[in-house]
Amino acid sequence: MSIYLIRHGKTRANEDHLYCGSTDLPLSPAGLAELGELRYDIHPTRFVTSGMRRTDETLKALFGNVPFTVDARFREVNFGSFEMKSYDMLKDDPAYQAWITGDNEANIPPQGESGVQMTRRVLAAFSELPDGTALICHGGVIAAIMAACFPAEGKHRYQWQPLNGHGYELSGDTYRPIP
């Protein structure tokens, strides 16, 4: 059996290159159209989302009106005061500079959470997923899971982040990109 990790479709924040973790955005029209072009040849027996609009809408666009459960532990990292802002908006902010030039896995954005904190909650939830589950979630969440499951690959967490609407099938100690 397998577990399927699928990143939500594009949102306005993705298109505008904004930090978006805790903001509950819908898919953009372009994101919905792109999902309509994807063809998944997978057969999950269970579906889980983070409960954010963008993940629930992605599930429906890809798999129709299937029953699913919500686990909020699979939500994206909380970017705190950097939420819904771009690099250009933040580049002169000393707190932002400290976050991006230091260890941004351990550093915490003001009113947000660190990558380490997010990874802990995500991996705790991931350990409970049964085989056959399709998890529709977020790029940072998928990247954290993949980095933890495949450390021998030597990739930084961000190198695992799939494109919107894409993801990975995990089967035992192997993986493949999907769709």
Walk through the language-model features, giving the residues of each.
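Conserved histidine-centered catalytic loops in small-molecule metabolism enzymes
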Residues: 42-73, 96-98, 150, 171-179
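Domain-level recognition of soluble alpha/beta enzyme cores
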Residues: 152-178
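Phosphate-handling substructures
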Residues: 62-121
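Generic beta-sheet signal
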Residues: 3-4, 45, 131-140
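Short hydrophobic/aromatic-enriched beta-strand-loop microsegments
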Residues: 26, 66-73, 153-162
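Short active-site segment of divalent metal-dependent hydrolases/proteases
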Residues: 11, 141-142
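Short beta-strand scaffold positions
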Residues: 49-50, 120, 136-137
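Active-site-proximal alpha-helix that buttresses catalytic centers in soluble enzyme cores
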Residues: 3-66
